[in-house]
Amino acid sequence: MEKYEKIAQELGVSLKQIDTVLTLTAEGSTIPFIARYRKDATENLDEVAIKAIIDMDKSLTALADRKETVLAKIEELGKLTPALKEAIEQAEKLADVEELYLPYKEKRRTKATIAREAGLFPLARMILQDQKELERAAEEFLSEAFPTVKDAISGAFDILVEAIAEDPQLRNLTYQEIRKHSLITSSLKDESKDEKQVFQIYYDFSEKIANMQGYRTLALNRGEKLGVLKVGFEHPVDRLIRHFEARFKSKNSYIEEVINQALKKKMLPAMERRIRTELTEVAEDGAIQLFSENLRHLLLIAPLKGRVVLGFDPAFRTGAKLAVVDQTGKMLTTQVIYPVAPAKAAQIEAAKEELKRLIRQYSVEIIAIGNGTASRESEAFVAEVLKEVPNVSYVIVNESGASVYSASELARHEFPELTVEKRSAISIARRLQDPLAELVKIDPKSIGVGQYQHDVSQKKLSESLDFVVDTVVNQVGVNINTASPALLSHVAGLNKTISENIVKYREEEGLITSRAQIKKVPRLGAKAFEQAAGFLRIPESENFLDRTGVHPESYPAVKKLFTLLGIREMDEEAQAKLKQIDTVSMAQELEIGPETLKDIVADLLKPGRDLRDSFDAPVLRQDVLDLKDLKIGQKLEGVVRNVVDFGAFVDIGIHEDGLIHISQMSQQFIKHPSQVVSVGDLVTVWVYKIDLEREKVNLSLLAPHESN
């Protein structure tokens, strides 16, 4: 129960909610299922809160297990005092447990170990007691390992240095002082390794550890790893020495030297490693959280349904790869054209005619242009062609990860006859039609909507991003008859094998026409059906409930509800009746929870609703904008492509995304850009600064008269 109380205090949830979540999880329920279909039991906890409870429970269990191991080992040594036992039991972090365990930990033989084995501990005690004529006293401790007085005193020194360096109280004091008062610094180590001067602001950098921002920590780590920067610390050494000296009754030159060695050779390097690790962990957590939030918004971008799209994968020498897909994402044709240099004039003219032919033949409505190599030149080419073709627009699509997908086993299986580049063009087109369905085919780490994602723990990053994808897929729901195995595998209760079995079943038996039929899929057992059924939509079913998010376990309640309200079919009259019900009393009548009833009614009122329709759709363009066309103070519309700790990057129709620095986001103080903007948002911006030489533009969310 003590563990539950800690979780409750930290997360602001009740003991009952914690018990419910952990019990349901132990029974095999998934986070999406608990969040959607067990709201009454959890008192409306969402996916993030449920995951936080599960994660903290695992963390506290691991901490308790480690404490148990450490206590047992120290007790075996016969050195477990009541005070030490209490300190370990009260420790709130694994790092604190390890600090307390350090003096008793088995370690490789050190100079201090050898000195203790040679019987020099009493000599070390004499140093602490300010023994007069220490050199004469040391003569009694000479041995084969320590044949001279100087050697013996040096050995005693080693014992004291290690003892002080491993003293838990002194280590904690040093740690707290460093946290409050020390600076982390960086200087230029090798300029030749930073030709573009990416790390220029860190060539002569210092910041209080207490004020260190996550993205700066990761920048220092990367610069150090690349050999560009040398990272160090500035400590209040004199202040620390005074604290250490206060611990000793005696004071002499020997003790001063012992303290100096313990602090500078042992304690500070150890604390620096700990601080660097902690700063990195905090920075990684922040970067992962930001990447996850960006990914969530990217996956929720409104799909452009029912449009014929031409995917345009730009390239210089090898030509642009085109792919036309119909309203359902089915590939109609692929082609290669040579629209930009080094192509000859005749090739470029032929490319124009071929693009116009494809647009007319397949009634293309939108062209999706990948934002990679040759994107700028390809955009200009497309814009020129569209002057001659009415009612067609283009969109610049973030193609990050498209090449990863196109070379994957999934893409090879889907389009075995096509080249990698043509598969990539199909992926770019489909990303516009249904971003979620297409992006789930790609490792989320390859999508590129974060900062320093390659510098953080890849295991933690994958876990966090997978959670985001799972959450969004289940919140949106999946058409079981059109979904790819990649999309199905993110549905609660389903795995790779079951997802592939569903697709195979469709291929062999035809369309699935009811949720009950799902049970016939091989390896899809009762628990998997319970977890997955509500998230799987079947538009072809005669039972309209199968087309909604209503779970089959609630079908009897819906039938009873319709009987009580006199509803025979879902028409306007039925909708009016549903809107007027008293949720609490009706839920009691139906013997279900009020939250469950609210969700049922919401699904009945909007059976085909798509969560993503409430989010912004991509901006369609028909003409290209050049950096030279921009003017300070000019008002533009744009789409947020990426959010980072220091601002947001916005696509305003020029080759490079413009940066809105955090200082240009609000007249009020904000801690983070995500308080104001999200990936996929449509924003009105004003040009704040133009750098033609570096081809950079700075933007502002504040109108010129508001900007500071």
What are these regions (language model features)?
Residues Q176-I184, F312-F316, T373-E377, V397-V404, ...:
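A glycine-rich phosphate-binding loop feature that marks nucleotide/adenosyl-phosphate handling sites
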Residues A49-A52, S59, L63-G311, A315-E417, ...:
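Duplex nucleic acid-engaging cores and interfaces of nucleic-acid transaction enzymes
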Residues T30-I31, T42, D46-P147, Q475-S614, ...:
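Accessory alpha-helical DNA-binding modules that contact the DNA backbone or grooves
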Residues E139-V149, K208, G227, F244-L263, ...:
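Low-complexity, acidic/Ser/Thr- and charged residue-rich accessory regions of DNA metabolism proteins
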Residues D96, V395, G401, S406-V476, ...:
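Long, charge-rich intrinsically disordered scaffolds of nucleic-acid metabolism proteins
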Residues S14-L15, E27-G28, L94, L120, ...:
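Short flexible coil/turn linkers enriched for glycine and charged/polar residues
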Residues I18, I337-P342, I366, A407-V420, ...:
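Short beta-alpha connecting loops at secondary-structure transitions
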